[in-house]
Design a protein with these regions (language model features):
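Nucleotide-sugar donor phosphate/pyrophosphate-binding loop at the beta->alpha transition
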Residues: 118-120, 129-149, 159, 186
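A short, charged, and often flexible helix/loop element on the N-terminal side
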Residues: 56-86
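Alpha-helix capping/helix-boundary segments
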Residues: 48, 103-104, 163-165
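Structural alpha-helical scaffold elements that stabilize or flank donor/cofactor-binding regions
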Residues: 87-89, 149-150
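An aromatic- and histidine-rich active-site surface loop
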Residues: 96-123, 128
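N-terminal subdomain of nucleotide-sugar transferases
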Residues: 1-62
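Helix C-cap/helix->beta junction micro-motif
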Residues: 36, 91, 111-115
């Protein structure tokens, strides 16, 4: 298969509405794939005034404000409704990339499996550690189990560093985890 044969449906909990490292990496990935001839369609929550313009086609996902005190800038995608499923059917992806194990990521995984489409998951953050910051560390074992259930159902898993891969392997998140290093933007960091 040539890169120009790829039809990628990318699901992201935050593609461009709030700037962070994960969505910067995803936007660069989409830009690179598009430049090489791949077809990419991004599915993520949309807001009226995003922090930056999205790279590629962006389809809005149903969402609600993040139900965590102090994180009102983030949205929680609630799944993929009928309109998104129709859009997926029309786009006809041959790979689904899920960048967040949120409700839309779970729904995208189920949809892809129902359509015999391979699923790549990328890990961008240590979600299992989040409860520590809200005095709910007791939830960490449950979150690890939920993440493991999600990631082991994916066909491939990638992480940004060897240390992250080692952590994910130790938690049994997937048997084979690839390295997706982001590199350094030489237009910003140069000698």
């Amino acid at each position: 298969m040539q890169i120009s044969d790829l039809r990628i449906a990318l699901f992201s909990g935050n593609y461009n509405y709030t700037r962070d490292g994960a969505n910067q990496a995803l936007n660069r990935l989409v830009g690179s794939l598009l430049a090489k001839g791949a077809k990419v369609r991004v599915y993520s929550p949309k807001v009226a005034n995003p922090d930056f313009e999205a790279t590629g086609d962006l389809v809005g996902l149903p969402n609600v404000p993040m139900p965590v005190k102090g994180r009102g800038e983030y949205r929680l995608p609630t799944g993929i409704g009928a309109a998104v499923k129709r859009d997926l059917e029309a786009f006809q992806p041959n790979i689904v990339h899920v960048s967040s194990p949120d409700p839309s990521g779970h729904a995208a995984l189920r949809w892809a499996q129902d359509h015999n489409i391979p699923v790549l998951a990328s890990v961008h953050t240590r979600f299992e550690t989040y409860p520590r910051y809200y005095n709910m560390a007791f939830l960490e074992p449950l979150i690890i189990r939920l993440l493991r259930r999600f990631y082991t159902r994916c066909d491939a898993l990638v992480a940004p560093s060897q240390s992250m891969i080692d952590e994910l392997l130790a938690m049994g998140m997937h048997a084979d985890i690839g390295l997706w290093s982001r590199g350094v933007d030489r237009t910003i960091f140069s000698s």
